[in-house]
Swiss-Prot record:
NCBIfam families, A to Z: tig (TIGR00115)
Keyword NADP: no
Top-level lineage group: Bacteria
Name of the protein: Trigger factor
Taxonomic classification: Bacteria, Bacillati, Actinomycetota, Actinomycetes, Micrococcales
Originating species: Kocuria rhizophila (strain ATCC 9341 / DSM 348 / NBRC 103217 / DC2201)
């Protein structure tokens, strides 16, 4: 087998593969063997049908096509390896010549068009200068953390006053479209200001006391009438406020591992300081990546982006779960931009990982699986099985490797805050980015 590559542009190649009949012959013989077991001809035992009779029954072209179907991927993979190409899309194959009835041992020639990973040149990325917002944990941050902890152990108490933000109200709801009831529910519990129910409900119930009602207009967001304009009647049947426990030693023992409220407050102060560093680290990480993208030109393959757009908008699964107004010109432009950005990030960080000889340990994969499974609310073992079953194990390794590569760049960056002070992110980088829960999306799924 011989192969040659013509790069049509930095992200697209045409591969010509010449396959000698001697290389194709094993696949032809295997095809005859399989057909001999499938075809029944009187006078011949199963598996003993001569190839000439098989040709008469199905045609020699059929045999060759099946042989090519079986063997072409191996030839294609060999050509990719020989020419050091990484494919990013499904190959488009054209068979230019192959064995025919009148020339049964002719060579085969195929042309394969495919999107490929572009080659980039990395600049000197060490010592990048980044500025982040000045952040310092304050007494207000510490008090907020304490109040949030107290709220988790608070109890709801019925009050005789108008509802305000943060209160819990009990509601009766009725939704009407064109004057006809389409949905109704009673005794719903809702936290005013949480924004987790219908748009407009917070404004409607704020200021209402038990027994009072209001009407507002909204767009239904789910169910059979999703997207419909509706008139909603809401009645408040109870108003409750959260009564917080006293911040004393007894509460500290109930809500934490500490014996005194002083120890608990000191720990919350430490957590607030760590959170400030994490926030600065995340901002610095994002800005380092933005700086790399500014410095490096990455050609983006149109085929890869089009495939992702099709998957996002046109697949049966996407159409089944899409809300009304999902496929708009503005949304397509947004998805396209996100896909292009993700592709550039991936290519750059893969190149950095290669330059830094970044590897991935099994323990790092386990940490990644645990962190991601928590974000999805899944058992880590089930999450790992889901990734493996969907063929995304390679994506997982690549994502961890890219995170480590970005941490390498961040390690050498000079980071200052908006006050001109040097920011020490050694604790943030030293976590291996485990503290990050709002990860930068660097993977473009169609490239794996």
């Amino acid at each position: 087998m011989k192969s040659a590559v013509e790069k049509l542009n930095p992200t697209e190649a045409k591969i010509t593969i010449d396959i000698a009949y001697t290389d194709l012959k094993p696949f032809v013989q295997e095809t005859y063997k399989e057909l001999a077991n499938q075809i029944q001809i009187p006078g011949f035992r199963k598996g003993k049908v001569p190839s000439k009779l098989i040709d008469q029954r199905v045609g020699f072209d059929f045999v060759v096509e099946n042989a090519l179907n079986e063997g072409l991927n191996a030839f294609y993979q060999q050509a990719l390896t020989e020419n050091e190409l990484t494919p990013l899309s499904q190959p488009q194959v054209e068979v230019l010549s192959k064995p025919e009835e009148n020339d049964r041992e002719a060579d085969t020639k195929v042309e394969i068009s495919v999107a490929i990973r572009p080659e980039i040149e990395l600049p000197d990325y060490k010592g990048l200068e980044i500025q982040v917002e000045a952040r310092e944990a304050t007494a207000e941050d510490e008090q907020k953390a304490l109040d949030e902890l107290r709220a988790r152990f608070g109890t709801l108490k019925t009050v005789d006053r108008p509802a305000a933000e943060g209160d819990h109200v009990t509601l009766d709801l009725q939704a009407l479209v064109d004057g006809e009831e389409v949905d109704a529910a009673n005794d719903l519990s809702y936290e005013v200001g949480s924004g987790t129910m219908l748009e407009g409900i917070d404004e409607a119930v704020t200021g209402l006391s038990a027994g009072e009602d209001a009407t507002f207009e909204t767009t239904l967001a789910g169910g059979e009438h999703s997207g419909a304009e509706a008139t909603v009647k809401v009645k408040v049947t109870a108003v409750k406020e959260r009564e917080l426990p006293e911040a004393d030693d007894e509460f500290a023992q109930l809500a934490s591992e500490f014996d005194t409220i002083a120890e608990l407050k000191e720990d919350l102060k430490k957590q607030a300081a760590e959170s400030a560093v994490v926030e600065q680290g995340i901002e610095a990480r994002d800005k380092v990546l933005d700086k790399l993208v500014e410095l490096i030109e990455v050609p983006v393959p149109e085929k890869v982006i089009e495939d992702q757009l099709a998957q996002h908008f046109d697949s049966e699964q996407a159409q089944a779960s899409a809300e009304p107004g999902h496929d708009t010109e503005e949304h397509r432009a947004e998805v396209r931009q996100n896909a292009e950005n993700a592709f550039r990030n991936e290519i750059i960080l893969d190149a950095v990982a290669e330059a830094e000889e970044v590897g991935v340990e099994q323990s790092e994969l386990i940490d990644y699986i645990i962190n991601m499974s928590q974000q999805y609310g899944m058992d880590p073992n089930q999450f790992a099985q889901m990734l493996d079953g969907s063929g995304q194990a390679g994506m997982m390794v690549g994502e961890v490797r890219r995170r480590k590569a970005l941490a390498k760049v961040l390690e050498t960056a000079t980071v200052t805050d908006s006050n001109g002070e040097t920011v020490d992110l050694s604790s943030f980088v030293g976590t291996g980015d485990d503290a990050e829960t709002d990860e930068v999306e660097t993977e473009a799924s169609a490239t794996e």
